[in-house]
Regions:
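Mature N-terminal, pre-catalytic/accessory segment of carbohydrate-active enzymes
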Residues: 2-8, 14, 19, 23-74, ...
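Catalytic-core regions of glycoside hydrolase
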Residues: 42-43, 154-313
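A diffuse structural propensity rather than consistent per-protein peaks
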Residues: 49, 87, 230-231, 368
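Hydrophobic alpha-helical scaffolding
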Residues: 87, 122, 159, 228, ...
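Conserved short hydrophobic patches within well-ordered secondary structure
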Residues: 139, 149, 296, 413-416
């Protein structure tokens, strides 16, 4: 059932286990949906434009999110120039966003990241507390009642000082205004592996967790910076480490650490309960982020019954209409983000990968080898045709963002077809002296060279189509 916008959680109304008007209760949360759930504009790179933010607010309402967290890393007044007031034109834009959020029943949460140069102690610390309160006061007058102060991605690890700063700002803000809602933070050690060693809190996390008031909601990113899935057991360990229920800043579909690949899959399986808040960090390409964000909304509304694959298929159908089948074939090859420290998102092209593995294990005379060959050929052709249609029919703004990946999909599909033909030609060497086999091998090598030349700008289906083509090229 899609009319989730009529099911609004009664946050700020004193509901046990939810985000209360006076702060955040830290009792275990058993309710479904997740009480505070939404999108955090928290990526590095070019921030969203006003039109994109207005669009995402409407999207939040339609999909059942109830919060948008403003925290663009490359907004200078959010981070480097955090003490300075916003220029009038930017302040007008923020005011328009706050007004639009209220119209959409979406909570606008305003965040500042002062950690690069904030003073936490002494007179300078007092001055910076007043600077932060002044910054928040301007936004409060625009209608903002929910705030955040983040200390992520900085070198200094003064846990006690940060906790004191947060406590003072939260307390003074609430004393000034009785209608302040949530007050959130992200610590400097913001994922589980960095918070502890052998299950024992590291000094920073120990000081921060011990000193922080329980009316400040802590967000963390899970087991790693970008590592999925996240189990209930893993969340329970993090909660126990902090002695409170932690909220989740989930780094998918954000791809600012590997922009050559788009995150077009569903959100990984996540905990089924005891989560007070969740925010999904998107890509800088707002429109293409919506597939994953819609699945995140499905999870946040009903964690117990979230089905990633089903949610993903339904999101694509809703968003792409007559192009849904084509988009699903393309997006299937662009779901998982993986490097030496990140591993998040479901596997790329699982059907293609499984069929390719079966084919190479059994070719040429094993059971089902010929059927696998025919199936893989059909899959390659379908992906080429789908990418071709999308190149012609996608909306211009989306096409601009994913053209390199679509073109790489066409290259990979063509190379897959050549690889399949090469497998057949290898069985006919006795008949033609290997002429066709040599010709196809040369063609495949040229196609692989073209694929490699474009990997610096576009990655897709690396461990499915890409792996199959390379495996066949090495095969003798």
């Amino acid at each position: 059932m899609r009319f989730r916008q009529v099911r609004k959680m009664a946050v700020c109304l004193g509901v046990s286990g939810a985000i209360l008007a006076g702060g955040v209760t830290m009792q275990p949360v058993s309710a479904s949906p997740v009480p505070l759930r939404g999108v955090i504009e928290g990526f590095y790179g070019t921030p969203w434009q006003q039109e994109e933010r207005l669009d995402i607010l409407a999207f939040c309402r339609a999909e059942g999110f109830n919060a948008y967290l403003y925290a663009p890393k490359d907004d200078p007044y959010h981070r480097e120039k955090w003490r300075e007031p916003y220029p009038e034109d930017k302040l007008r834009e923020l005011g328009a966003l706050v007004k639009a959020a209220k119209a959409q029943d979406v909570r606008f949460i305003f965040a500042v990241s002062p950690g690069l140069d904030v003073s936490l102690h002494g007179y300078k610390g007092y001055v910076d507390r007043q600077k932060m309160l002044a910054k928040f006061e301007v936004l409060y007058r625009l209608g903002v009642c929910d705030f955040a102060v983040f200390f992520d991605d900085i070198k200094d690890k003064d846990g006690a000082g940060q906790a004191s700063f947060l406590n003072d700002v939260s307390r003074d803000l609430r004393r000034r205004h009785a209608d302040i809602g949530a007050f959130l933070t992200v610590p400097t050690e913001y994922f589980y592996a960095d918070m502890q060693e052998g299950g024992v809190r590291k000094p920073y996390t120990d000081a921060f967790a011990e000193g922080l008031s329980h009316d400040v909601l802590v967000l963390y990113t899970g087991d790693g910076v970008a590592k999925g899935p996240l189990t209930d057991e893993a969340l329970a360990k993090a909660d126990a480490l902090y002695g409170r229920a932690l909220g989740l800043w989930w780094n998918y579909p954000v791809n600012d650490y590997m922009e050559t690949k788009l995150a077009l899959g569903p959100v990984d399986p996540l905990p089924k309960g005891n989560l007070p808040a969740i925010f999904f960090n998107p890509m800088k390409v707002e429109a293409l982020s919506k597939i994953a964000l819609a699945t995140g909304a499905d999870y946040a509304e009903d964690p117990e019954h979230y089905d990633p694959e089903k949610s993903w298929q339904e999101a694509i159908k809703r968003q792409y209409g007559p192009l849904a089948n084509d988009m699903a074939l393309f997006a299937a090859g662009s779901r998982r983000l993986e490097n030496d420290w990140a591993s998040i998102g479901l596997a790329d092209d699982p059907d293609f990968a499984a069929t390719a593995e079966r084919l190479l294990e059994r070719w040429p005379d094993g059971a089902g080898a010929r059927e696998a060959h025919a199936a893989l050929l059909a899959m390659a052709d379908a992906r080429a045709k789908a990418a071709g249609r999308l190149l012609k029919e996608l909306p211009p703004e989306q096409l601009k963002a994913c053209r390199p990946q679509l073109e790489q999909t066409v290259r990979l599909a063509s190379a897959s077809r050549t690889a399949l033909m090469l497998l057949q030609a290898q069985q006919a060497v006795a008949k033609d002296g290997g002429r066709n086999e040599r010709s196809l091998r040369d063609k495949l090598q040229r196609e692989l060279t073209a694929i490699d030349q474009h990997e610096a700008e576009a990655e897709v289906s690396e461990k499915a189509m890409g792996a199959f083509v390379r495996n066949v090229a090495r095969r003798r």
